[in-house]
A protein has these predicted regions:
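Hydrophobic cores of alpha-helical transmembrane segments in multi-pass inner/ER membrane proteins
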Residues: 13-22, 73-91, 155-170, 218-223, ...
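Membrane-interface segments at the starts/ends of alpha-helical transmembrane spans
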Residues: 1, 59-68, 136-152, 261-273
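Generic multipass alpha-helical transmembrane bundles of integral membrane proteins
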Residues: 99-232
Length: 319
């Protein structure tokens, strides 16, 4: 990976691989166990907020974890985890004597796309902010090496396109199995890959030497389960792995001092990564717009891909 990264020590990559598998393992624990999810995404954050993070992630700390973005990203990811658990498990008995579930309420189904869009928007703002720093020759910001350039604006546009192409949230349902996963069948592989490319470009642009973890590791940890463990539950996988890593990084910022994998600091690499992300999201936006127009759909109400084989496979597996 000499084009993007310059680390050659096998031990560093072994640590990186361990992080990937640890994220997938804890995600699976939080997914398949209700109490595991409560412990990881409700109890642990409260404990960390009171006793740990005020010391390890204080503003201006030497590891760069005390900036506004890390705090906001951590709590927005946790909000997603808790909200998705509510959709999966909250139920009550109504005046009609019947059992009702939160996910049956259409207003509740607006939460997943909303928190996702907010999460992407946070990163878009950070990319624009990085461009505004004017670090054309590169410099250290929040104790991490950064460089400003047109790639920040390119990737910000890709992020906006990624938000625009979020679709089909009224088709979200809860799986029939014991884990009761939040299934979003209209969120197919095209959007997921476009998101992954955009998000990796964002981490490469704005977290540079930390991007093998905040970008590659996190994206692999949520994308692999989506395709091979529990299809249709990408957003649930993404929120949980992101929250897990964010909590870990806030609690143990020293991790980067011995396991950091620096980028090549090559402007061409930054430009290329963001160009790929912009192209992928541009193609997705055009393709999706054509489908919407051809089928006469309302993207705010209708599912875009419910006539595809992949959509039907996800529904059949989980409903």
């Amino acid at each position: 990976m000499g084009i993007l990264y310059q680390a050659s020590d096998p031990m560093v990559w072994a640590i990186w691989l361990f992080v990937v598998f640890a994220l997938m393992a804890f995600n699976e624990f939080g997914r398949t166990s209700v109490w595991g999810g409560v412990a990881l995404f409700a109890v642990a954050p409260i404990v960390f907020t009171i006793f740990v993070w005020p010391n390890t992630a204080a503003p201006g700390n030497e590891y760069g974890t005390g900036n506004w973005f890390n705090w906001v990203k951590t709590y927005s990811a946790l909000a997603g985890c808790v909200g998705f658990m509510a959709l999966r498990f909250v139920k009550w008995r109504g005046a009609d004597g019947r059992e009702h579930h939160l996910y049956e309420k259409r207003w509740a189904l607006c939460f997943p796309p909303l928190i996702l869009a907010i999460n992407i928007c946070e990163a878009v703002i950070r990319d624009v902010q990085m461009f505004g720093y004017g670090l054309w020759g590169g410099a250290v910001v929040d104790h991490v090496w950064m460089i400003s350039g047109p790639w920040n604006i390119m990737n910000a546009i890709a992020g906006v396109l990624n938000i625009i192409t979020i679709c089909g949230w009224f088709g979200i349902f809860i799986s029939k199995d014991k884990s009761r996963d939040m299934i979003w069948p209209d969120m197919l592989w095209m959007w997921i890959i476009a998101y992954d490319l955009w998000n990796f470009a964002y981490t490469y642009n704005c977290m540079s030497d930390h991007s093998t973890y905040t970008g590659l590791a996190l994206l692999i940890a949520c994308t692999v389960p989506t395709f091979f463990t529990k299809r249709g539950a990408w957003l649930q996988h993404r929120a949980q792995t992101l929250a897990l890593y964010a909590m870990f990084a806030m609690a143990l910022p020293q991790f980067y001092t011995f396991a950091e994998i620096p980028t090549t600091h090559n402007p061409t690499a930054f430009f290329a990564v963001s160009l790929v992300a912009l192209a992928a999201n541009g193609v997705l936006a055009v393709y999706q717009f054509r489908r919407i127009r051809a089928r006469g759909l309302n993207p705010l109400k209708d599912e875009i891909y419910n006539d595809t084989e992949k959509y039907r496979e996800v529904v059949e597996e989980n409903r």
